[in-house]
């Protein structure tokens, strides 16, 4: 891997790996090698959830479990992680197989989000829980400062449904129009039909649920509710 690109990435992350094979594995999609990042992603997902939950618990001592859960979901969802990945310019560092490269996998939100979680898992194994916790808090500082409890933290499908119900309009319909990839690494494309919008809204994700949420979020933006 290009050492200039990797050094720039580590500066953006705010962390330098002692064991570079962990960084290489974290950046490797399963389409590129049998030594890929899915186990690190599994580990990083759990660590991220703990760190964000702990931060919210101490920042909002009077907020109930439901609002804290919704805030955590907002902070750890795929499109938030993909935003962070783009801030790190992570796409140009990914190791992808030829098929994923050809189809633009370095731009795909699900791959970017999964890689951020894999990096978290890699940093943990390379250091300790205190180091990775502080690193995550650094990455999330602005988002943690800006987030607040309330209806805004409900998931997009719920907010879209409540908006339409409040205006006595039909509920949105979601239709799977395409499923790409093998069973272990699929991408779903959903069309969401919403009253008041002339064309179906498109959402993609690594599961049907995630694709529906992405479509609902896009619909909310088009309705100028975001």
Curated annotation (Swiss-Prot):
The record's section on Gene3D superfamilies has: 3.30.160.20, Ribonuclease III domain
Active-site residues are 45, 117
Give start and end of each RNase III domain: 6-128
The catalysed reaction is:
Endonucleolytic cleavage to 5'-phosphomonoester
Q: Which cofactor does it need?
A: Mg(2+)
Predominant localisation class: cytoplasm
Which EC numbers characterise this protein's activity in its record? 3.1.26.3
The entry's Mg(2+)-binding residues are: 41, 114, 117
* Any GO BP: mRNA processing
Q: What is the main EC category here?
A: hydrolase
Q: Where in the cell is it found?
A: Cytoplasm
**Matches recorded under PROSITE patterns:** DS_RBD, RNASE_3_1, RNASE_3_2
GO MF terms listed in the record are: double-stranded RNA binding; metal ion binding; ribonuclease III activity; rRNA binding
Q: Which UniProt keywords apply?
A: Cytoplasm, Endonuclease, Hydrolase, Magnesium, Metal-binding, mRNA processing, Nuclease, RNA-binding, rRNA processing, rRNA-binding, tRNA processing
User: GO CC: one term?
Assistant: cytoplasm
Q: Where is the DRBM domain?
A: 155-225
What the entry lists under Pfam families is as follows:
dsrm, Ribonucleas_3_3
Complex formation: Homodimer.
Task of the protein: Digests double-stranded RNA. Involved in the processing of primary rRNA transcript to yield the immediate precursors to the large and small rRNAs (23S and 16S). Processes some mRNAs, and tRNAs when they are encoded in the rRNA operon. Processes pre-crRNA and tracrRNA of type II CRISPR loci if present in the organism.
Q: Which NCBIfam families match?
A: RNaseIII
Family membership noted in the UniProt record = Belongs to the ribonuclease III family.
- Give the protein's recorded name: Ribonuclease 3
Specify the species. Enterobacter sp. (strain 638)
